[in-house]
Curated annotation (Swiss-Prot):
Protein name: SH3 and PX domain-containing protein 2B
Domain characteristics, as noted in the entry: The PX domain is required for podosome localization because of its ability to bind phosphatidylinositol 3-phosphate (PtdIns(3)P) and phosphatidylinositol 3,4-bisphosphate (PtdIns(3,4)P2) and, to a lesser extent, phosphatidylinositol 4-phosphate (PtdIns(4)P), phosphatidylinositol 5-phosphate (PtdIns(5)P), and phosphatidylinositol 3,5-bisphosphate (PtdIns(3,5)P2). Binds to the third intramolecular SH3 domain.
PTM comment text: Phosphorylated in SRC-transformed cells.
Organism per entry: Mus musculus
Bias type Basic and acidic residues, positions: 315-337, 486-499, 516-546, 569-584, 595-606, 615-625, 671-684
Role, per record: Adapter protein involved in invadopodia and podosome formation and extracellular matrix degradation. Binds matrix metalloproteinases (ADAMs), NADPH oxidases (NOXs) and phosphoinositides. Acts as an organizer protein that allows NOX1- or NOX3-dependent reactive oxygen species (ROS) generation and ROS localization. Plays a role in mitotic clonal expansion during the immediate early stage of adipocyte differentiation.
SUPFAM superfamilies reported for this sequence: PX domain, SH3-domain
Modified residues (Phosphoserine): S279, S291, S499, S528, S840
Gene Ontology cellular component annotations, sorted alphabetically: anchoring junction; cell projection; cytoplasm; podosome
Amino acid sequence: MPPRRSIVEVKVLDVQKRRVPNKHYVYIIRVTWSSGATEAIYRRYSKFFDLQMQMLDKFPMEGGQKDPKQRIIPFLPGKILFRRSHIRDVAVKRLIPIDEYCKALIQLPPYISQCDEVLQFFETRPEDLNPPKEEHIGKKKSGNDPTSVDPMVLEQYVVVADYQKQESSEISLSVGQVVDIIEKNESGWWFVSTAEEQGWVPATCLEGQDGVQDEFSLQPEEEEKYTVIYPYTARDQDEMNLERGAVVEVVQKNLEGWWKIRYQGKEGWAPASYLKKNSGEPLPPKLGPSSPAHSGALDLDGVSRHQNAMGREKELLNNQRDGRFEGRLVPDGDVKQRSPKMRQRPPPRRDMTIPRGLNLPKPPIPPQVEEEYYTIAEFQTTIPDGISFQAGLKVEVIEKSLSGWWYIQMEDKEGWAPATFIDKYKKTSSASRPNFLAPLPHEMTQLRLGDAAATENNTGPEAVGPSRPLPEAPHGAVDSGMLWSKDWKGGKEAPRKASSDLSASTGYEEISDPTQEEKPSLPPRKESIIKSEEELLERERQKMEPLRGSSPKPPGMILPMIPAKHAPLARDSRKPEPKLDKSKFPLRNDMGLECGHKVLAKEVKKPNLRPISRSKAELSEEKVDPTSQNLFMKSRPQVRPKPTPSPKTEPAQSEDHVDIYNLRSKLRPAKSQEKALLDGESHHAAGSHDTALSRSFLPGEGPGHGQDRSGRQDGLSPKETPCRAPPRPAKTTDPGPKNVPVPVQEATLQQRPVVPPRRPPPPKKTSSSPLSCRPLPEVRGAQREESRVAPAAGRALLVPPKAKPFLSNSSVGQDDMRGKGGLGPRVTGKVGETREKAASFLNADGPKDSLYVAVANFEGDEDTSSFQEGTVFEVREKNSSGWWFCQVLSGAPSWEGWIPSNYLRKKP
């Protein structure tokens, strides 16, 4: 006899709809045998369930019945969902889990994986070779066909009261949920199905979507005699006191567990489960899902089907498998100890005073998803209170600032970090580190808006330091489990007798004396359910309202929202940074990396490490060195360190000690006044936290030129008259690809920023036509006042770099960036400009490209020369510090030297 073949591989390929004998879905499975044969079989989910029960019966040890830790038999994805086999979504959802189950099954030891049950299951059957043909749609099935049970329309009910399950055979409900009714029972317990589970629920928690009540009255001649099997003390005026053994007449029945009875000439309501018909057994509380309504009971406690499968025939197994939890095995003793009183527990009464269907609740709001924050790129800080980190680290966000800087904590370190380097992920049970990919530009814009909205809603205890709100704690759901432990008449105090008390820990079960031990617990009244829920919801609303109303103010911005029209030339520019002015300034931070932090050049050149928001991505600009862009022409934001003034700075030289990088945001014209104002607002928050620029405009000059540098939203027009020149570099600046942080200034700037640090906003594209003048608002507050002096406006603070015989990388690309968005968002700019055109700007060899005109008079000092408005210069070198090496061509005696670039505009 040849050896029996074994299974080599099993692959679940897809699902397929079948209509014979009724509508259902089967799984298409490809089985490869050791003989080399490959066969296709079709199995519905219930067959897998049958196989699983056989496996658990045959291999109790491997099934984990005695020790769950020793279980090696895989779990099925879930129980059988009664009357759900015809729903495609249910079948598709289990496609992958079924495939994993089959693969795990055949990898078990041979005595399991090659046992008769497994081999027979995967053997080809006649119906696999000849699938049943579909019958005509109009043809009705014979009423005697026991398999024609699936094609039925299930009633749908809406949950009108929360319910927390008390037994494993029950399921919990939440207000607004829609359930399918599989079985209705006179006991008041209905077997229902949701998208995920099935079980028993009290009918009084449900209401038909059409408001129809399941109730029927009996004619006087049809009134039935029932015997009271448990004493009952009325808790409401319309209820009846019952004594054990009393015979009552049932006047009105319903399917909600409360019947109207007549006793001693009075009529009232009593729990149906406390009564039994004189001629038979007590009314069974719950019916099996396959039993007809109002028929005999079938105990469905939701225990493992394995417990009920022992010693039963397959037909019984098929009838009762629904509602079982396959993976949860309950010891036999636990089943035997289940008291009938729990299964006879009456449901809460429905409030008859509330019209049905009056206010069907809306579906509940889904719970908030807890989120975690991780760094998505490496960051090296250059500010005293910043924090450096690597990519992929979990951080705790302590404070979010609309300026684009967040105060975070990582283990024992904390400091300011750019929000664009941090992303949030949904918290999951698996602690696997997320795959960190930099968000796309359009995603960053959405993230910025989402973060701004989240910041407004954040609540938390009083924080240490300047406005340090903590994220809002997730809203906890109302504890519906305690709703049933109250007196069910709302605010009325009922007699708390031992026979009518409710225990919060056991749901409906009563605390009664030993003689009444088998008595079912008293049902809560329906009206009390509603009142109690309203009280709890109102209490919850009152608790949440102050929290919602006390959302923290956004961290302050340094700049005013709308700049003054004419800022004085001698405006103080070295005031210490105020702590609270930022709060006046609701800003939109969509500048990406341009917020004052240092990013290494190697990161800038890696697109996936640039979490930057820009309205139109320009890949060509990614190659431009971030440290080498000129301050006037730069149209792409700089991913550069947030510079601090050089220690060589002499406060006595000028009160306009400005940051050479922050200055760049002040010099570019904008296309329109409206956008310029918007840009000014949004970039005030992004300015440098330790340096800034303050200046005014010449009369007659218009605002709105700053947007011409795409993304630098703080920029000013070249027509704008700067109050003072930008600081020059203390030494020749290497415009190469390396970022050299500027030396830190005095100790006054070393202190921790009281507001989130800021970096220069992105530059904007230059506009050829000057509009009305828009003054640059003062950037620095009181911090600049401490060390200010009053020298001549426009006097340089730092020694300019020496002229170089070649065009460095810093000068190269400045004109290119004129029409490009750079690394930051492009507010305005010519979208149609191509990289070829930009490349022509890079090599500023022709005289036309290197000719600039002075837009204002400049008073020099011992290191610089003065010039008048209208002087024509040929730019020899553009330095990233904001100072250009130029030669005078007209309007003044010929000379060469360093001049501030914000006094120049390109000659038309």
